[in-house]
Amino acid sequence: MKQALRVAFGFLILWASVLHAEVRIVIDSGVDSGRPIGVVPFQWAGPGAAPEDIGGIVAADLRNSGKFNPLDRARLPQQPGSAQEVQPSAWSALGIDAVVVGQVTPNPDGSYNVAYQLVDTGGAPGTVLAQNSYKVNKQWLRYAGHTASDEVFEKLTGIKGAFRTRIAYVVQTNGGQFPYELRVSDYDGYNQFVVHRSPQPLMSPAWSPDGSKLAYVTFESGRSALVIQTLANGAVRQVASFPRHNGAPAFSPDGSKLAFALSKTGSLNLYVMDLASGQIRQVTDGRSNNTEPTWFPDSQNLAFTSDQAGRPQVYKVNINGGAPQRITWEGSQNQDADVSSDGKFMVMVSSNGGQQHIAKQDLATGGVQVLSSTFLDETPSLAPNGTMVIYSSSQGMGSVLNLVSTDGRFKARLPATDGQVKFPAWSPYL
């Protein structure tokens, strides 16, 4: 917990720009198919009202994962304050085999102790599957709740939780001197802040693998440019500003390289920069357009979009040489892929029969599953644990963010109140 707090501390310097017009998750479908679980309001040991509803945060996280269906508070058979107070029969009668209880205690120095216990209702009374406690300041209470959620999620599913992650996205506001904003928020839309404001369009944010930097495209110089911004201090490094197009940045998983697309020689082609030396080398060549690179876990291979066969399709290429190999064959066109961190599958924008949706492709079998059902879906980005996808879609005259689970069952929206939202990018583990 302490190490995670140190990593996240770099964001505090930007909290002066925290916005009130935040996005929030609105669930559309799929939660009913999740595993039932009980999450009891955490017991508050201080005067007055608790400063944060930690139990509510844990319940929302588990619900937002699409894998759990927390029992509504009005239906809780009891509200135990500790593992010893849980009555297994009361919960098992409702089909619930796991219950989360917890406590929040204020300390004399102004900090808080947050503790939780995950109780097995199928075992002897008081059987604890997992437990932990954290000492945090007030501004880190939500983070402590997300930490508890991560641990509960991993214990029950075997999958690392991703509730302490963030999302970056571009908002086009309604007028003003700087109508384009690059923003970052917690994965659930809370604690939103502005990274950069611009009078000209901003595009394609991409996270560094340690979560400390964002690469993105800006047009503030009068033409497109690729920059990398350090979140802790706002420092900006210009990576590329060649004639014509500079776009689609993607950090390698090992953090040593940045892939992007340039059209300085005419057609769009892929290039890779060694971030330590600044040396750039060309990866693809030819008269076709090659863009939207995404890395495989080995930091040596890229998936990318190319129209070399006529319509856009996804190809794979080794950055050290060799001919690209086409890897998508279903649908009239496929583009803008994002490869999972384990390299087993990718998500992409797939078009067929006049529809444009987010699809998942198994990279071993080639099997494709359409995940989304929204309109004109774009720019999918995977959560680091591979369980969820965030993407943008058209709604009315604007664009919004959406979530869909990689099994296609759970669907949700993150509506914004102050502009169109595009180019979402899910952070690595923080």
UniProtKB/Swiss-Prot annotation:
<dbReference type="InterPro" id="IPR014167">
    <property type="entry name" value="Tol-Pal_TolB"/>
</dbReference>
<keyword id="KW-0574">Periplasm</keyword>
<comment type="subunit">
    <text>The Tol-Pal system is composed of five core proteins: the inner membrane proteins TolA, TolQ and TolR, the periplasmic protein TolB and the outer membrane protein Pal. They form a network linking the inner and outer membranes and the peptidoglycan layer.</text>
</comment>
<keyword id="KW-0131">Cell cycle</keyword>
<dbReference type="GO" id="GO:0042597">
    <property type="term" value="C:periplasmic space"/>
</dbReference>
<keyword id="KW-0732">Signal</keyword>
<feature type="signal peptide">
    <location>
        <begin position="1"/>
        <end position="21"/>
    </location>
</feature>
<protein>
    <recommendedName>
        <fullName>Tol-Pal system protein TolB</fullName>
    </recommendedName>
</protein>
<keyword id="KW-0132">Cell division</keyword>
<comment type="function">
    <text>Part of the Tol-Pal system, which plays a role in outer membrane invagination during cell division and is important for maintaining outer membrane integrity. TolB occupies a key intermediary position in the Tol-Pal system because it communicates directly with both membrane-embedded components, Pal in the outer membrane and TolA in the inner membrane.</text>
</comment>
<dbReference type="InterPro" id="IPR007195">
    <property type="entry name" value="TolB_N"/>
</dbReference>
<dbReference type="Pfam" id="PF04052">
    <property type="entry name" value="TolB_N"/>
</dbReference>
<dbReference type="Pfam" id="PF07676">
    <property type="entry name" value="PD40"/>
</dbReference>
<dbReference type="GO" id="GO:0051301">
    <property type="term" value="P:cell division"/>
</dbReference>
<dbReference type="GO" id="GO:0017038">
    <property type="term" value="P:protein import"/>
</dbReference>
<comment type="similarity">
    <text>Belongs to the TolB family.</text>
</comment>
<dbReference type="InterPro" id="IPR011659">
    <property type="entry name" value="PD40"/>
</dbReference>
<dbReference type="InterPro" id="IPR011042">
    <property type="entry name" value="6-blade_b-propeller_TolB-like"/>
</dbReference>
